[in-house]
Amino acid sequence: MDIIFCTPTYCKIMLMIIMLISLRTRCDTNNFLNCSVEKEEGEEEIISTNLKRINDDMNILGRILNDERNIKITDIVEMLQNEYDDKKKKKKKKKYIYRKKKSNNKINEINSVQHFNVKENILNEKKKNPLNDNFKNPKLRKHSPNNKKNKNKIGQIKFHIVGYDKKKITKYLTPSMISSIQKRLMNKNKKTNVNVNMSNGRVLPFFPKEYFLHSSTHEKKDKMATKKNNKEESIINERLLENLENISLSRTIKDIRGEEGNERKVKEEDNNIKEEGNSFKKYFKGVVKLYVDITEPNLEMIWQNYPPKSITGSGFIIEGHLIITNAHNISYSTRILIRKHGNSGKYEAKILYVAHDVDIAILTTDDKTFFDDVYALHFGALPSLKDEIITIGYPAGGDKLSVTEGIVSRIDVQYYKHSNYKFLLTQIDAPLNPGNSGGPALVRGKVVGICFQSYKVSNNISYIIPSTIISHFLLDIHKNKDYTGYAFLGVKYEPLENPSLREALGLEEMERKKIIKKNVGILITEVFEGHMSKQDDKYHDMDNKHHNVGDTHHNVGDTHHNVGDDHTDNLQGDTDYCTYILNSNIITSDKKNIYSDKKKKKIYSDNNNNNNNFNYYYNMHGEDEQSCYGLKKNDIILRVDGKDINNDGSVILRDNETVGFQHLFNEKFINDLCIIKIVRNKKIKSVMVKLYKVKYLLNQHNWDKRNKYFIYGGIVFSILTRSLYVYTQNPEINKLMLYNNFKKKSKDEIVVLKNILPTKITTGYYYTDSIVLRVNNIKVKNLKHLIELIEMTKYTNRLMYLKNNKHTLQSYINYYNTKITSLNINTIIHILILTTSGQKVPIVLNKRDVEKYNEEIKKIYSITRDRYVY
């Protein structure tokens, strides 16, 4: 048998070579553990992490190399085992049995060389191999010296290492120790999978946890890496993905029902579907009932919750063991149970993803027997007007399944009640009642929407979330391994229907000269600066990712010119968008092509005898990069990705159907690009815009999030959210919401005085729903800032005043302030508020009184914690 050992000097040289190869280090020849790393750009963090892990192993080997005698592998293993046993006794961990190696006297007599073939008379000794007793795996036992059939295969000793993360790693300690240890060090961040059949007996780790490759100090990082790898697995399987890719927003009636000129086949298919739809048994198997327990926050006593209550809803099953329902069904949920049709058993469900903006949620259950004998529903295209539609669900008035029938009456962009965002929706005349929410709406056996809201004022007006919105939600999860949300343009606009207004802006003259089409264009009145600013470097590629103009093929005009993959693959770093726009042949209409001339730096049009053609060109000489992307106030939007914007803010959806132009951006994903044709200073040009989430001063929804609050001396402070805004009667807040939608800074919040609790120190204060302007003469930025101002000392107050005095709510609220100079902030808290009547009123509290009665106030009003800030 070959025995592997080395002298301390040889091991030092060997390890130095390994570290030089693996990490490009410079090491001191006298102390190989102290190395200076040659860091390249972007590798500081990676190298420092790897070096730390290697140093852990070096410390172990360093202790071994301090021994002056010849070291054998069996001695190394025994030494590691003894150290682990000592630690195990101290920490009183669960006892494990590890392989222990016995020394061989005859082997100890061998001189120190790199390789040595032991004579056969030594192998024939009747001594057991110290590794043989502990090898439970038959594949490993074949290397035992007692196995006569394998005498010619005893050139290696295989050590089987099993990590605590259940991953098996097999290493060979061969005579070539350099390559062996080098392989180990170079593959620290890689998982090695070895197909080794485990026997019924448990194979214990060869090295204890402290000596394993990913152990102790790196345990948290390894867990995070495992979690990240699990997150990268998409929940959208191939069947569902194929179904989603076939859904189109602009499919015509001919595309849905069949090819042109094949009417007979279409009629036969429709008849078959109707005959099959008379029973609908298989579709019933795909619809489930939800039993949800919820606990909503109390908006009056903001530190408490309302008592728990139970609601019911509907959902339906799709491919991949997924269940689709409405987000408002499971908001603030503490437990969700689901029940199949025709089955009395209830299964506990869990939430995978929630999109509150479009009111969709994905559920599943860990009990996979639930999906036995169910039918996964498939999605269909956007329905056409007058299509017969069937809704299935569990509405109020009974416990069993209910089916209603109606027709598609309208497709438009309207507000979603749950989020207060505008998205595409489908109006139907089938009645929907509480409990129908989350159920499927079917056309020809395909899901074309999710039932979610109705119009109470009129009869038989209900709405469903169209399949195109559902498809975007699922594809976003598949693409980004998480739900990132919808992109918005981030502007306010005014329709340009008035002829006098169009004349003043120069549009009438452009129409007469046939430079632009008639009745197109909207005026931008306000722009979210954080969305359009180049200074924020938002138009540059982040993390070296490629950002395409949408994920699908968006045609600029009616020809097949792709603005997506052909050009935007090179959009990295500092991109010259003027050059990009010039390089793309911008198509302006189906009858007129506008081309770009790179040499002359002009965008011009061909002229022929057709009266609908446009005669103009735009000279791009002297254009800087700043002017080629982003929108500005007073710009007039004419086209978005080749689609004309009408003067009322609508755009053609398909055929002669029109919807709000916001839907063009709802088709795209976060960080997608679009080309927008505008009129700026009475000149026509094209600019690039990258789409982001818009940061609103008042969140449009705050579901599943508890309101922030801070209670001081019986005064309850909070931030203005939509849930609070609905219940406030302050006209100043109404003005604030009407005229100020976008945040000026990312951390801006409107801090409000929600109410004042009756206490001994709040006598005479009866204000509610008031805006907090200042604390101790310093303007309040957000709730966290307010807490800092109240709890600060005199010295920190001066520093805070100098640091934060420039920031002011006057950008949102205009008021005149009179400074109070005689304030002793060590004992007095002075709060300036704007009341519901528009008055600026001071509230003064004594810090000593607050400290004295603080515990009493908490006890009276059952306040367990005086603040909730995140």
Curated annotation (Swiss-Prot):
Keywords: Cytoplasm, Host cell membrane, Host cytoplasm, Host membrane, Hydrolase, Membrane, Protease, Serine protease, Signal
InterPro entries xref list: DEGP_PDZ, DEGP_PDZ_sf, Peptidase_S1_PA, Peptidase_S1_PA_chymotrypsin, Peptidase_S1C
One Gene Ontology term from the biological process aspect of the record: proteolysis
Biased composition (Basic residues): 138-151
Signal peptide: 1-29
Disordered: annotated segments: 128-151
GO CC annotations, alphabetized: cytosol; host cell cytosol; host cell plasma membrane; membrane; symbiont-containing vacuole
Compartment(s) where it occurs, according to its Swiss-Prot or TrEMBL record: Cytoplasm; Parasitophorous vacuole; Host cell membrane; Host cytoplasm
A Pfam family matched in the record: Trypsin_2
EC number: 3.4.21.-
Bilayer topology term: Peripheral membrane protein
Induction (free text): By heat and oxidative stresses in trophozoites and schizonts (at protein level).
Active site: 328 (charge relay system), 359 (charge relay system), 437 (charge relay system)
Alphabetized GO MF terms: serine-type endopeptidase activity
Origin: domain of life: Eukaryota
Domain notes per entry: The PDZ domain is dispensable for protease and chaperone activities.
Biological role: Serine protease which also acts as a protein chaperone. Plays a role in the parasite development in host erythrocytes possibly by protecting it against thermal and oxidative stresses.
Family: Belongs to the peptidase S1C family.
PANTHER family attached to this UniProt entry: PROTEASE DO-LIKE 10, MITOCHONDRIAL-RELATED, PTHR45980
Assembly description: Oligomer; may form trimers or hexamers. Forms a complex at least composed of DegP, ENO and HSP70.
Protein name: Serine protease DegP homolog
High-level lineage: Eukaryota, Sar, Alveolata, Apicomplexa, Aconoidasida
